[in-house]
Amino acid sequence: MTATKQHKKVILVGDGAVGSSYAFALVTQNIAQELGIIDIFKEKTQGDAEDLSHALAFTSPKKIYAADYADCHDADLVVLTAGAPQKPGETRLDLVEKNLRINKEVVTQIVASGFKGIFLVAANPVDILTYSTWKFSGFPKERVIGSGTSLDSARFRQALAAKIGVDARSVHAYIMGEHGDSEFAVWSHANVAGVGLYDWLQANRDVDEQGLVDLFISVRDAAYSIINKKGATFYGIAVALARITKAILDDENAVLPLSVFQEGQYEGVEDCYIGQPAIVGAYGIVRPVNIPLNDAELQKMQASANQLKTIIDEAFSKEEFASAAKN
């Protein structure tokens, strides 16, 4: 994709709850001029495309249709939400093997179409499936991106904002590491309108230290809470994906928390995709933003990466995945 291209095309692979919510977000936020939707349930996809097109008189012109893999050849962005859903009591990492098989099949067909754009991965476990998308595609690491901790960071900012009584957009704070149980809050660099969070709390007494611990736990475990109540999470991640999509298609050079390839940005963290802030634009990841972590945070980053690496190494020791790797 070039930054000057006017007609922006997105292909969505996976028309489940996350995918259809993402498609709706693209329509209502006037993002892209063309949206093709791929799913094994073609009739459902056709119905969604028709339903979404009925909103266009209220938004902006857009071509929306049920697509095939051949339609990926000239897409600027392919968004992968296809995968087995996370069930109550199941961790994101429990999904690994079945979703790796789906990922391999999907990515192979997309690359065969002649696709030269950017992959944006949202299926879980997202850090591992972003890595496998990079391996199976043979693409440069900058053009394979995962949604990473974008939603986790949004949940964190919203929870802090609600606790201290400000707009979430005035809270600047990140969750880093795995999108999952080993993620961690970067407390050392959290701030409210430029005021360090700890300085803010000292001056305003909005919450004590135990309150912060409880707040992080609620953020980390938010998906489990939602899944237990309604079966799946999809609205929050859909809007996060729409935000990332806009940053790419509009060449924003926006700083967003994403699943980014690691090659020594942090000591002891290499050869995996994991959540950290990065600058993203029309050509994918421009560069990671390496927040200076304190010793405790760095240890958490290393532990999170080691957990992911153990699972990745085990998965790619199997012939069915190792033989398909191009990177």
UniProtKB/Swiss-Prot annotation:
Residues annotated for NAD(+) binding in this entry: 18, 39, 44, 69, 83-84, 122-124, 147
Pathway the protein acts in: Fermentation; pyruvate fermentation to lactate; (S)-lactate from pyruvate: step 1/1
Alphabetically ordered keywords of this record: Allosteric enzyme, Cytoplasm, NAD, Oxidoreductase, Phosphoprotein
Binding site for beta-D-fructose 1,6-bisphosphate: 157, 172
Gene Ontology biological-process annotations: glycolytic process; lactate metabolic process
A GO cellular component annotation in the UniProt record: cytoplasm
Predominant place of localization: cytoplasm
GO molecular function terms noted in the UniProt entry: L-lactate dehydrogenase activity
Pfam families referenced in this protein's UniProt entry, alphabetically: Ldh_1_C, Ldh_1_N
Gene responsible for this protein: ldh
Gene3D superfamilies found in the cross-reference section: Lactate dehydrogenase/glycoside hydrolase, family 4, C-terminal, NAD(P)-binding Rossmann-like Domain
Reactions listed under catalytic activity: (S)-lactate + NAD(+) = pyruvate + NADH + H(+)
Catalytic residues (positions): 179
Protein name: L-lactate dehydrogenase
Its job: Catalyzes the conversion of lactate to pyruvate.
NCBIfam families with a match to the protein in the record: L-LDH-NAD (TIGR01771), PRK00066.1 (NF000824)
Classification of source organism: Bacteria, Bacillati, Bacillota, Bacilli, Lactobacillales
Enzyme class: oxidoreductase
InterPro entries per UniProt: L-lactate/malate_DH, L-lactate_DH, L-lactate_DH_AS, Lactate/malate_DH_C, Lactate/malate_DH_N, Lactate_DH/Glyco_Ohase_4_C, NAD(P)-bd_dom_sf
Family recorded in the similarity comment: Belongs to the LDH/MDH superfamily. LDH family.
Phosphotyrosine, modified sites: 224
Binding site residues for substrate: 86, 92, 124-127, 152-155, 233
